[in-house]
C-alpha cells in the first residue's frame, strides 16, 4: 500500500497536467479508503468507525482534491459517494469516543466530544446518537438546562429515535462471549 501511495503522489507531482492525472488522485483516495478495511476487521466484525480516523481523513482529502480539481472526471461520482461514507464514519468515530468518555464517568469530555461531532459533521446519521450522549452527559453533570436544550433538539430532529427505547440492538462479534 505504501509504495502505491508514493507512486500516485509522485505521478501527481511530476505530471500535474497529464490528461489522466485524475486517476492518480482517485487512486490516492482509494488507497487510504481501503486502509480502513482488512480481513481482520471482517473476521472479528470490528466496526471500522472504532479505529483511528487518520486514513479516513486522508482518503477524504484526496477525494476532495479530485472533486474540486476535476469535477467532470469519470471518477468524481464515486469519489463523492465515498466522501459521504467517510464523513459518516468520522462522525461515528467521534460518537464512539464520546461514549467511551461517558462510560468512564468523564461526562464533560463526553458532552464536548458529542458536541464536536455535531458541529463538524452536520448531516451525518451519527448525530442522533451524539445528541443522546449530550443529553445523558448533561443529566449526569446536573446541567438540567443544557440537558433540556439537547433533548429538545433531539426530539425535534429525531421524534422516533431508537434511543428513546434503549438504543439500537447490536450484534456482538463471535469472540465476545460475555
Model regions: which residues?
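Acidic, polar-rich low-complexity tracts and alpha-helical solenoid repeat scaffolds
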Residues: 1-178
